């Protein structure tokens, strides 16, 4: 980190890159003794962006530590924002992963899930610890997401790889084929007959 003083941070306020209160929090942390106490997910995300802008590893570490704490109180209203923060910054949080796995059906019914890109959907659903009663539940989550997305055949194939087709009945496959656009149907049939599968833990 290059040397800077308080006035350098004050100058940032005039550039309108970061909020004034965020700059003040960073200034007091870097040059004072104030700790980061905010529980605002949005503020923590902006603080982390500022820490990266300043190349201040100490501030980054403190923000991550605080986000880890806030993550313990994650809910359906903020899960996607928190998830995006960790994913975009190459970070992991076991509590976040556990929350997603245990509440997958509720999460997949949110608008935030339907707006995710294909990589995020795969990241969320391709997990052996997801708690579901049957694999068809996961397939329906993917189908609902596809209703809101127009993806190419490569992305369709990619997202379908999260399905353990060994646990899908032919009747369930037939129902799924009826729900998807015609251009995907042959691909889905082919994937089913390949029986690509990995273990899945089911909630009995």
Curated annotation (Swiss-Prot):
Similarity annotation: Belongs to the orthopoxvirus OPG030 family.
Keyword Ubl conjugation: no
Record-linked Gene3D superfamilies: 1.25.40.420
Keyword annotations from UniProtKB, A to Z: Early protein
Keyword Endoplasmic reticulum applies: no
Protein name (Swiss-Prot/TrEMBL): Protein OPG030
One protein family per Pfam: BACK
InterPro entries: BACK (IPR011705), Orthopox_C5 (IPR009177)
All copies of domain BACK, residue ranges: 95-177
Triggers of expression: Expressed in the early phase of the viral replicative cycle.
Highest taxon of source: Viruses
